[in-house]
Amino acid sequence: KSALSGETEFLNRTVRVPWEPLRRVLRMNRIADMKGCNYSVARSSLLAINGFDEEYEGYGREDTDVELRLQHLGLEIGSLKGVALQYHVWHPRREFTPVNDTRLEELKRSKRIHCRQGLTTLTDAEGRDLASKI
């Protein structure tokens, strides 16, 4: 119902295309950037970059930060469009927080892999380290 009423964005991401040659022809295996709403990464890789950078404020760029640091680590970003289906409900877009754009540009220049405020700084209610539980 959501797709018919126009509430679903990116309807092309809801179609399963299991045949790799057709996915190539349709350019489904190319990505502009990694979206935080639908991706997976090996635990060891996420730990190596210290997860999401908690220094980002407001809206936007934190998923691109993860993508860049994974690439700086030497990983190639791939796409599962047509294989891992995604339903994205429409919502109004928010403005990106300008300080996040600045932070992302600095990351591009520095080629940094590990963030300061990531998994290793997370604690539970009793103050115990959470990174070791991931």
Report the location of each language-model feature.
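Intrinsic low-complexity, glycine/proline- and repeat-rich
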Residues: 15-16, 111-134
